[in-house]
């Protein structure tokens, strides 16, 4: 989903309480800006903030419902999809100042449960388990994210002027640390670093034996 485009759902009562709480926690304000043409290259600071609000609000809801339905973050099939969605929300939380010392999703979830609990009572009946999973996953991935950010910065510092980021490092982050490749691409885009995505695909195929 492209959260740089305008989606009217984000102006509904479903997201308003979550956005208000997110604003209180982060000190940032959601203004509903949409990047011109829907492009996410070279976003202004406010555009980055607004995209982060939309990603977090949507992903919190998706992950919470999945856990309530018994599909928890994991390494297999649907579980892996849930984990990647959760991790993407955590990554965008960094834009708003959240970190291992300032967790995000478990703090926001009670607002979602209160807002949607009447229509979806499982959000309240399974609140303890949902919070437990969110807290554990966020703690684990924040540590992974910190390591990944450090490695990206170290590799960046060794690049020649205008040089491409090494595809081997992207694969290492994924293979060794479980760092999603699309998230590494996001970090590189933020730093205006080039990467040969076809080379990464080739290396991943070798790793998988395909």
Where are these regions (language model features)?
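A glycine- and charged-residue-rich anion-binding loop/surface
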Residues: 1-210
């Amino acid at each position: 989903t492209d959260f740089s485009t305008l989606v009217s759902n984000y102006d509904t009562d479903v997201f308003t309480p979550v956005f208000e709480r997110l604003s209180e926690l982060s000190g940032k304000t959601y203004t509903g800006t949409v990047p011109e043409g829907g492009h996410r290259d070279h976003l202004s600071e406010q555009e980055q903030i607004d995209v982060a609000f939309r990603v977090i609000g949507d992903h919190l809801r998706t992950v919470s419902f999945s856990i309530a339905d018994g599909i928890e973050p994991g390494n297999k099939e649907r579980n892996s999809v849930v984990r990647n969605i959760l991790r993407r929300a955590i990554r965008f939380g960094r834009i708003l100042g959240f970190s291992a010392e300032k967790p995000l999703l478990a703090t926001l979830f009670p607002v979602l449960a209160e807002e949607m609990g009447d229509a979806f009572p499982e959000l309240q009946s399974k609140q303890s388990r949902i919070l437990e999973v969110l807290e554990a996953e966020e703690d684990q991935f924040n540590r992974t994210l910190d390591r990944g950010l450090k490695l990206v910065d170290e590799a960046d510092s060794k690049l020649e002027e205008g040089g491409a980021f090494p595809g081997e490092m992207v694969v290492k982050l994924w293979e060794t640390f479980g760092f999603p490749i699309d998230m590494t691409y996001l970090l590189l885009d933020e730093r205006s670093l080039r990467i040969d995505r076809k080379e990464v695909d080739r290396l991943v195929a070798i790793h998988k034996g395909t």
